[in-house]
């Protein structure tokens, strides 16, 4: 992942621990008067509150590896899980149609089977991501929350495995309850929020986009390798990658426990003391459990009021709104598999190659195109970092819109592949949008804002999952070109996201 580094001297990574005050991008547009008194340097520039015991490169690598391990465990079961779901639905459908068990299954690509598959998978994704709407988790230590969230994700996958292992005991729709386990720690939302906040705390402006890109590159490597690998293993037995993913997740939890530093959020130690202090005092002065909970809730509300000045900035709100539909880019992966399998009668192992294609293009974008564009816009066009990030985000948005629309119109496998390629060129939308947003927010509010961003991402997923599932059902019922109706919806939503980014003023 070193190929994602922009053309800046490598010693910048080690120098930031000693000289970070020259990063003028950290002059915030938000909360300037209040925060200036607490976190500015003598020359008036904001100084990011970071843990200087850890090198930014180390934090970026650890966050990327944690993402890689977690995402491999999640991605390797994408195709096998769809195959298992489809088999259970198909068997039940033809048993009901024939009126007798034991008769052979027919074509599993028929509309009733695929509609039920879209319904179950779409609502499962929604319920899985409802626990992701947490705000205050990062106040209790990033490492602790990260570990608990990973355990919750593991238990969630185990529940799905139990339901599908005993289809005669549990109805398949019982997989919708897998989200309950992700209440433990906040699920994938907390993993994402903690990793990105750790990077934002430790990396200066000129390295931030690269660090974010490394995390996204880890996700892409997982997709590039694990999705087709899981599909290939599913040809032998779909349960092989399912059990393998659980083992890999356990290893990931052990890795995070040993390697991830126990870093508190930037600015967590305030004038009134650290979170640990107020928790201790709560236990001393309020011995009952109920009163302790009440004290913690009041403290959370007070802290939110202190940190909520960024809510009044319209430009920040516009950027955050664009993240609401950004997660659709990730969710389209599962839709693409089922769409290609249903429309062109592909097996899931063949359809999974589309995911690998997208991941390969994404890696090229992060390794070559983004650094090149950044260099050209800064050196040749003399744009500052904030404007540069905005322009690249707009380009990414256009690619997402065009790619989604082409996939909607795809009448042949070649057109679908072309649309997927164009769509993949815009995958870095969230990378540069995060950097764009970070450059406009006071460092003291980074943890809070990034938790808000993650909430917007998963809020979009919670609403978008059943929405795309329903549109896929409609498309399958209408047939023809309308099978790709979810991609038309995605194109419309990405257009709204591009409009929000364009409307945000960059100073």
From Swiss-Prot:
Give TM regions. Answer: 59-79, 146-166, 180-200, 216-236, 240-260, 316-336, 359-379, 398-418, 421-441, 449-469, 481-501
Keywords from the named record:
Cell membrane, Membrane, Transmembrane, Transmembrane helix, Transport
GO CC annotation, single: plasma membrane
- Report any Pfam family annotated for this entry: MFS_1
Involved pathway(s): Mycotoxin biosynthesis
**Recorded phenotype for the gene knockout or disruption:** Decreases the production of ustiloxin B.
Biological function: Efflux pump; part of the gene cluster that mediates the biosynthesis of the secondary metabolite ustiloxin B, an antimitotic tetrapeptide. Probably involved in self-resistance through the export of ustiloxin B.
Record-given protein name: Efflux pump ustT
Which organism was this protein described from?
A: Aspergillus flavus (strain ATCC 200026 / FGSC A1120 / IAM 13836 / NRRL 3357 / JCM 12722 / SRRC 167)
Lineage of origin: Eukaryota, Fungi, Dikarya, Ascomycota, Pezizomycotina
